Protein backbone atom coordinates (compact mmCIF):
# COMPACT_ATOMS: atom_id res chain seq x y z
CA UNK A 1 0.00 0.00 0.00
CA UNK A 2 1.32 3.43 -0.91
CA UNK A 3 0.47 7.00 0.08
CA UNK A 4 -2.57 6.22 2.18
CA UNK A 5 -4.07 9.19 4.02
CA UNK A 6 -4.11 9.48 7.79
CA UNK A 7 -7.29 8.41 9.54
CA UNK A 8 -7.17 11.79 11.29
CA UNK A 9 -7.12 14.62 8.72
CA UNK A 10 -6.04 17.07 11.43
CA UNK A 11 -2.94 15.08 12.26
CA UNK A 12 0.24 17.08 11.80
CA UNK A 13 3.49 15.69 10.46
CA UNK A 14 5.64 15.39 7.39
CA UNK A 15 3.72 14.19 4.32
CA UNK A 16 6.59 12.14 2.85
CA UNK A 17 10.27 11.28 3.26
CA UNK A 18 11.36 14.08 0.94
CA UNK A 19 9.91 16.62 3.39
CA UNK A 20 12.33 15.26 5.98
CA UNK A 21 15.47 15.00 3.84
CA UNK A 22 15.30 18.20 1.78
CA UNK A 23 15.16 20.57 4.79
CA UNK A 24 18.17 18.77 6.26
CA UNK A 25 20.17 19.47 3.11
CA UNK A 26 19.11 23.12 3.16
CA UNK A 27 20.23 23.56 6.76
CA UNK A 28 23.45 21.59 6.39
CA UNK A 29 24.67 23.50 3.32
CA UNK A 30 23.73 26.97 4.57
CA UNK A 31 26.80 29.22 4.88
CA UNK A 32 26.01 32.92 5.28
CA UNK A 33 28.66 35.57 4.76
CA UNK A 34 27.45 38.02 7.39
CA UNK A 35 25.84 35.71 9.92
CA UNK A 36 27.55 32.88 11.77
CA UNK A 37 25.72 29.72 12.75
CA UNK A 38 25.13 31.23 16.20
CA UNK A 39 23.28 34.24 14.68
CA UNK A 40 20.71 32.51 12.50
CA UNK A 41 17.92 30.02 12.99
CA UNK A 42 16.45 27.49 10.58
CA UNK A 43 13.11 25.85 11.26
CA UNK A 44 11.63 22.72 9.71
CA UNK A 45 7.91 21.97 9.88
CA UNK A 46 7.76 24.24 12.92
CA UNK A 47 4.84 26.42 13.97
CA UNK A 48 5.46 30.04 12.98
CA UNK A 49 3.24 32.37 15.03
CA UNK A 50 2.76 35.74 13.37
CA UNK A 51 -0.09 37.74 14.97
CA UNK A 52 0.08 38.93 18.58
CA UNK A 53 -3.62 39.84 18.50
CA UNK A 54 -4.45 36.25 17.55
CA UNK A 55 -1.65 34.37 19.33
CA UNK A 56 -2.80 30.91 18.24
CA UNK A 57 -2.70 31.72 14.53
CA UNK A 58 0.26 30.10 12.87
CA UNK A 59 1.62 28.67 9.65
CA UNK A 60 3.99 25.73 9.39
CA UNK A 61 6.55 26.26 6.61
CA UNK A 62 8.48 23.27 5.39
CA UNK A 63 11.68 25.25 5.97
CA UNK A 64 12.48 28.83 6.95
CA UNK A 65 15.49 30.97 7.80
CA UNK A 66 15.65 33.84 10.26
CA UNK A 67 18.86 35.87 10.48
CA UNK A 68 20.24 38.10 13.22
CA UNK A 69 18.65 36.08 16.00
CA UNK A 70 20.43 33.77 18.44
CA UNK A 71 20.58 30.13 17.39
CA UNK A 72 19.12 29.21 20.78
CA UNK A 73 16.12 30.99 22.24
CA UNK A 74 17.33 33.69 24.65
CA UNK A 75 20.78 32.27 24.00
CA UNK A 76 20.33 29.04 25.93
CA UNK A 77 17.21 27.04 25.06
CA UNK A 78 15.85 25.06 22.10
CA UNK A 79 12.74 26.45 20.42
CA UNK A 80 9.42 24.60 20.36
CA UNK A 81 8.10 27.15 17.86
CA UNK A 82 8.99 30.56 16.45
CA UNK A 83 6.97 33.52 17.72
CA UNK A 84 7.60 36.54 15.52
CA UNK A 85 6.44 39.26 17.92
CA UNK A 86 8.52 37.75 20.73
CA UNK A 87 11.68 37.30 18.65
CA UNK A 88 11.34 40.68 16.95
CA UNK A 89 12.31 39.19 13.58
CA UNK A 90 10.45 37.56 10.70
CA UNK A 91 11.92 34.97 8.32
CA UNK A 92 14.13 36.17 5.48
CA UNK A 93 13.48 33.00 3.46
CA UNK A 94 10.63 30.52 3.40
CA UNK A 95 10.72 27.32 1.34
CA UNK A 96 7.62 25.24 0.69
CA UNK A 97 7.81 21.78 -0.85
CA UNK A 98 4.75 21.07 -2.96
CA UNK A 99 2.53 18.13 -2.08
CA UNK A 100 -0.35 16.83 -4.20
CA UNK A 101 -3.51 18.75 -3.41
CA UNK A 102 -1.65 21.58 -1.65
CA UNK A 103 -0.66 23.59 -4.71
CA UNK A 104 -3.27 26.31 -4.22
CA UNK A 105 -2.34 26.70 -0.56
CA UNK A 106 1.33 27.25 -1.42
CA UNK A 107 1.02 29.06 -4.76
CA UNK A 108 -2.38 30.79 -4.65
CA UNK A 109 -3.15 32.17 -8.16
CA UNK A 110 0.29 31.05 -9.39
CA UNK A 111 -0.76 27.40 -9.28
CA UNK A 112 -1.21 27.50 -13.05
CA UNK A 113 1.84 27.77 -15.31
CA UNK A 114 0.60 31.16 -16.51
CA UNK A 115 1.75 34.09 -14.37
CA UNK A 116 -0.91 36.69 -13.64
CA UNK A 117 0.92 39.94 -13.07
CA UNK A 118 -2.26 41.90 -12.32
CA UNK A 119 -4.75 39.53 -10.69
CA UNK A 120 -8.35 40.67 -10.25
CA UNK A 121 -9.02 42.48 -7.00
CA UNK A 122 -11.50 39.86 -5.87
CA UNK A 123 -8.70 37.27 -5.94
CA UNK A 124 -6.39 39.19 -3.65
CA UNK A 125 -6.08 37.22 -0.40
CA UNK A 126 -5.74 40.36 1.69
CA UNK A 127 -9.02 40.28 3.59
CA UNK A 128 -9.59 38.15 6.64
CA UNK A 129 -12.85 36.29 6.07
CA UNK A 130 -15.45 35.70 8.73
CA UNK A 131 -17.80 32.81 9.31
CA UNK A 132 -20.16 31.73 12.10
CA UNK A 133 -17.27 30.80 14.33
CA UNK A 134 -15.69 34.25 14.00
CA UNK A 135 -12.57 35.50 12.28
CA UNK A 136 -10.58 32.96 10.32
CA UNK A 137 -6.80 33.07 9.84
CA UNK A 138 -5.65 34.53 6.51
CA UNK A 139 -4.34 32.51 3.59
CA UNK A 140 -0.69 31.44 3.71
CA UNK A 141 0.15 33.76 0.81
CA UNK A 142 -1.24 36.78 2.66
CA UNK A 143 0.72 35.90 5.78
CA UNK A 144 4.02 35.56 3.93
CA UNK A 145 3.51 38.54 1.62
CA UNK A 146 1.47 41.07 3.60
CA UNK A 147 1.91 40.22 7.27
CA UNK A 148 5.48 38.97 7.51
CA UNK A 149 6.72 40.49 4.23
CA UNK A 150 9.20 37.65 3.78
CA UNK A 151 11.78 38.85 1.22
CA UNK A 152 12.16 35.48 -0.52
CA UNK A 153 9.46 32.84 -0.87
CA UNK A 154 10.55 29.73 -2.78
CA UNK A 155 8.44 26.77 -3.84
CA UNK A 156 9.85 23.47 -5.12
CA UNK A 157 8.11 20.42 -6.54
CA UNK A 158 9.92 17.11 -6.28
CA UNK A 159 7.57 15.73 -8.91
CA UNK A 160 8.56 18.17 -11.67
CA UNK A 161 11.84 19.37 -10.07
CA UNK A 162 10.62 22.90 -10.73
CA UNK A 163 11.85 25.73 -8.53
CA UNK A 164 9.88 28.96 -8.33
CA UNK A 165 11.05 32.10 -6.57
CA UNK A 166 8.84 34.98 -5.44
CA UNK A 167 10.63 38.10 -4.27
CA UNK A 168 8.97 40.79 -2.19
CA UNK A 169 9.10 44.02 -4.24
CA UNK A 170 7.12 47.18 -3.46
CA UNK A 171 4.68 45.40 -1.18
CA UNK A 172 3.92 42.46 -3.46
CA UNK A 173 5.49 39.19 -4.51
CA UNK A 174 6.95 39.16 -8.01
CA UNK A 175 7.94 35.86 -9.56
CA UNK A 176 11.54 35.82 -10.72
CA UNK A 177 12.38 34.31 -14.10
CA UNK A 178 14.66 31.26 -13.75
CA UNK A 179 16.51 29.29 -16.40
CA UNK A 180 14.60 25.98 -16.73
CA UNK A 181 17.80 24.19 -17.76
CA UNK A 182 19.73 25.46 -14.74
CA UNK A 183 17.32 26.91 -12.17
CA UNK A 184 19.23 29.12 -9.77
CA UNK A 185 18.37 32.29 -7.91
CA UNK A 186 20.73 34.69 -6.16
CA UNK A 187 19.41 36.10 -2.88
CA UNK A 188 21.27 39.40 -2.88
CA UNK A 189 20.19 40.46 0.61
CA UNK A 190 21.84 37.35 2.04
CA UNK A 191 24.66 37.03 -0.52
CA UNK A 192 23.89 33.38 -1.18
CA UNK A 193 22.21 31.48 -3.99
CA UNK A 194 19.76 28.60 -4.14
CA UNK A 195 19.47 26.22 -7.05
CA UNK A 196 18.47 22.75 -8.16
CA UNK A 197 21.38 20.34 -7.78
CA UNK A 198 21.39 16.74 -8.92
CA UNK A 199 23.44 14.46 -6.74
CA UNK A 200 23.47 12.05 -3.82
CA UNK A 201 22.31 13.02 -0.36
CA UNK A 202 21.74 10.50 2.41
CA UNK A 203 22.18 7.70 -0.11
CA UNK A 204 19.52 9.02 -2.50
CA UNK A 205 20.38 10.43 -5.92
CA UNK A 206 17.88 12.90 -7.32
CA UNK A 207 17.29 16.63 -7.79
CA UNK A 208 17.59 18.62 -4.57
CA UNK A 209 17.54 22.25 -3.53
CA UNK A 210 21.00 23.34 -2.48
CA UNK A 211 22.83 26.56 -1.63
CA UNK A 212 25.72 27.91 -3.71
CA UNK A 213 28.27 30.69 -3.23
CA UNK A 214 29.11 33.83 -5.20
CA UNK A 215 31.41 31.83 -7.50
CA UNK A 216 28.60 29.43 -8.32
CA UNK A 217 30.04 26.55 -6.30
CA UNK A 218 27.65 24.26 -4.46
CA UNK A 219 28.20 24.61 -0.73
CA UNK A 220 29.17 21.39 1.07
CA UNK A 221 27.39 19.73 3.95
CA UNK A 222 29.22 19.44 7.25
CA UNK A 223 30.08 15.82 6.37
CA UNK A 224 31.37 16.76 2.92
CA UNK A 225 33.35 19.63 4.43
CA UNK A 226 35.07 17.28 6.87
CA UNK A 227 35.80 14.80 4.06
CA UNK A 228 37.29 17.61 1.96
CA UNK A 229 39.40 18.76 4.90
CA UNK A 230 40.74 15.23 5.46
CA UNK A 231 41.51 14.85 1.75
CA UNK A 232 43.34 18.18 1.67
CA UNK A 233 45.41 17.14 4.68
CA UNK A 234 46.26 13.82 3.01
CA UNK A 235 47.34 15.53 -0.21
CA UNK A 236 49.41 18.09 1.69
CA UNK A 237 51.16 15.31 3.63
CA UNK A 238 51.88 13.40 0.43
CA UNK A 239 53.31 16.55 -1.15
CA UNK A 240 55.66 17.10 1.81
CA UNK A 241 56.72 13.45 1.68
CA UNK A 242 57.44 13.66 -2.05
CA UNK A 243 59.55 16.78 -1.52
CA UNK A 244 61.55 15.05 1.22
CA UNK A 245 62.12 12.03 -0.99
CA UNK A 246 63.36 14.16 -3.85
CA UNK A 247 65.62 16.20 -1.56
CA UNK A 248 67.12 13.05 -0.02
CA UNK A 249 67.75 11.53 -3.43
CA UNK A 250 69.47 14.69 -4.62
CA UNK A 251 71.72 14.86 -1.54
CA UNK A 252 72.66 11.20 -1.73
CA UNK A 253 73.48 11.54 -5.41
CA UNK A 254 75.66 14.53 -4.50
CA UNK A 255 77.80 12.24 -2.34
CA UNK A 256 76.50 12.98 1.16
CA UNK A 257 76.34 10.12 3.66
CA UNK A 258 73.08 8.79 5.04
CA UNK A 259 73.90 10.33 8.43
CA UNK A 260 74.48 13.76 6.88
CA UNK A 261 71.26 13.54 4.84
CA UNK A 262 69.28 12.41 7.88
CA UNK A 263 70.58 15.31 9.97
CA UNK A 264 69.99 17.88 7.24
CA UNK A 265 66.40 16.78 6.49
CA UNK A 266 65.39 15.76 10.00
CA UNK A 267 64.83 12.14 8.98
CA UNK A 268 65.72 8.88 10.68
CA UNK A 269 68.81 7.14 9.36
CA UNK A 270 66.68 4.06 8.67
CA UNK A 271 64.45 6.13 6.39
CA UNK A 272 67.38 7.38 4.38
CA UNK A 273 68.83 3.88 4.16
CA UNK A 274 65.49 2.59 2.97
CA UNK A 275 65.47 5.28 0.31
CA UNK A 276 68.87 4.14 -0.88
CA UNK A 277 67.53 0.62 -1.31
CA UNK A 278 64.17 1.31 -2.92
CA UNK A 279 64.41 4.81 -4.39
CA UNK A 280 60.76 5.50 -3.55
CA UNK A 281 60.39 5.00 0.19
CA UNK A 282 57.33 6.88 1.52
CA UNK A 283 57.94 8.80 4.71
Q: What does each of the following model-derived ranges do?
A:
Residues 1-15, 32, 53-54, 72-93, ...:
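C-terminal interaction segment
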Residues 278:
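Alpha-helical DNA-recognition elements
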Residues 1-45:
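Charged, glycine-rich intrinsically disordered N-terminal tails and low-complexity linkers that flank
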Residues 23, 27, 60, 91-92, ...:
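Generic internal hydrophobic packing segments that stabilize the cores of diverse globular domains
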Residues 37-39, 44-81, 85-86:
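Short, His- and charge-rich active-site/binding loops that engage polyanionic ligands
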Residues 265-275:
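Short, basic interhelical loop/turn and adjoining N-cap
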Amino acid sequence: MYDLPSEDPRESGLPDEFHDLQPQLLSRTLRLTHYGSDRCFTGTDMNLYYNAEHPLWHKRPDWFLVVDVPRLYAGHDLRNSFVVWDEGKAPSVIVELLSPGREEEDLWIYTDERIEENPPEDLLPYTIEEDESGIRPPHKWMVYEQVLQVPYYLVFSRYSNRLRCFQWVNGRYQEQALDPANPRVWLSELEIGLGVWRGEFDGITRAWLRWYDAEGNWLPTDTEQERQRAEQERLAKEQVQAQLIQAAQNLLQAGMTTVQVAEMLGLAIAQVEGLQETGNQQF
